[in-house]
Amino acid sequence: MKLYDLKAQGLDLQENIPLSRYTFTQTGGPAEYLAFPKTLAELKELLAAAKEDQLPITVIGNASNLIIRDKGIKGLVIILTEMKEIKVEADKVHAQAGARIIDTSFAAGEAGLSGLEFAAGIPGSVGGAVFMNAGAYGGETKDCLESATVVTRDGEVKTYTNAELHFSYRHSLLQENDEIVIAATFALKAGDKATILDQMNYLNALRSYKQPLEYPSCGSVFKRPTGHFVGPMLIKAGLQGKQIGGAQVSTKHAGFIVNKGGATATDYLNLIHYIQKTIKEKDGIALQTEVRIIGEE
C-alpha cells in the first residue's frame, strides 16, 4: 500500500506544508508529505507506505529543540504529537511519545509521585526527552526512565530497558539508529503531592524568570562543555545581543537564540556558526550543538 492509498482511505496526509507552523523557532521549510498518526497502527501503515514509495522518513515530536533548514524536508515527515496518552499505574507513569513531558510530569505530581519534577518546565515531548536524555535543574530523563518502547522502520515493536539505551549527557542509543520511540515508562516514588507540585511550580517560575519565553526559540542551543556554562562564556566573549537577520543571542539568557521577528533557519544557523567560530578563537573550545538540525542543505 502506498501513501496515496492511505489518503484515499481517510488518513490525513498533507503536502508541501511549511514546518515553521510546528517548530518552536517558527522557522523551517516545507514537508513534502506530512502526517500526524493517532495510533501505533497508523504509524506502522505510514512507515510501510513510505517504504513502498521509496520515500525518506523523518520523525519529530514537539519540535521544541529542533531547527529545520529553510529548504524543508524531502519525503514523509511524521509528527507524533497526536499519540499523547498518559496513564498512571501504582508508582509508574506510562506515556506515549507525543505526550508533552511537562504534562507527564504534572500527571505524576497530581498522583503524588516524585521523580519527574525536573521536567516540569521542559517543553518537549516524551519521545524527544528519551531520544536526547533531556534534563534540567539537576535531573535527567535517565534518572527515572524504566523502559522505552520503539518501532523500527520495518514495523517491529521492541522495548529497551534503561541500561540498554546507553544514556549519557544529552545522548541515547536512539541517536545512533533509526528506531522511533512510541512510548515510555517512568518508575517513580510515592511522595507528598503538595510538596511535589510546589517544587514543580517553583521550577516553572524559575524557568519563566531566567529564560526568554516571550520570544520563539529552540531552547538550549549548545551542550555544556565540561567545566563551563555556555551563557557566561558567550557574555564574556561579547556575544550577548549579537544578531544575524531575525535571530539574536538572547539578552535575557545568552544560552538561547531567539526569533526577534522574521528569522529564518539560515539566520539561526549562521548565528550558531558565528558563535562557534568566536568561542573557538577566544577560548579554544569547540561548542557542540544540543539542538537537533535537520532538513535539506
From Swiss-Prot:
Pathway it works in: Cell wall biogenesis; peptidoglycan biosynthesis
Gene Ontology BP term (one): regulation of cell shape
Keyword terms of this UniProt record: Cell cycle, Cell division, Cell shape, Cell wall biogenesis/degradation, Cytoplasm, FAD, Flavoprotein, NADP, Oxidoreductase, Peptidoglycan synthesis
Reactions listed under catalytic activity: UDP-N-acetyl-alpha-D-muramate + NADP(+) = UDP-N-acetyl-3-O-(1-carboxyvinyl)-alpha-D-glucosamine + NADPH + H(+)
SUPFAM superfamilies, alphabetized: FAD-binding/transporter-associated domain-like, Uridine diphospho-N-Acetylenolpyruvylglucosamine reductase, MurB, C-terminal domain
PROSITE patterns documented for this protein: FAD_PCMH
Location of the FAD-binding PCMH-type domain: 26-191
Localization per Swiss-Prot or TrEMBL: Cytoplasm
Cofactor(s) listed in the protein's UniProt record: FAD
GO molecular function list: FAD binding; UDP-N-acetylmuramate dehydrogenase activity
Entry keyword annotation includes Electron transport: no
Highest taxon of source: Bacteria
Active-site residues, as the UniProt record annotates them: R170, S220 (proton donor), E290
EC number: 1.3.1.98
Functional description taken from the UniProt entry: Cell wall formation.
Protein name stated in the entry: UDP-N-acetylenolpyruvoylglucosamine reductase
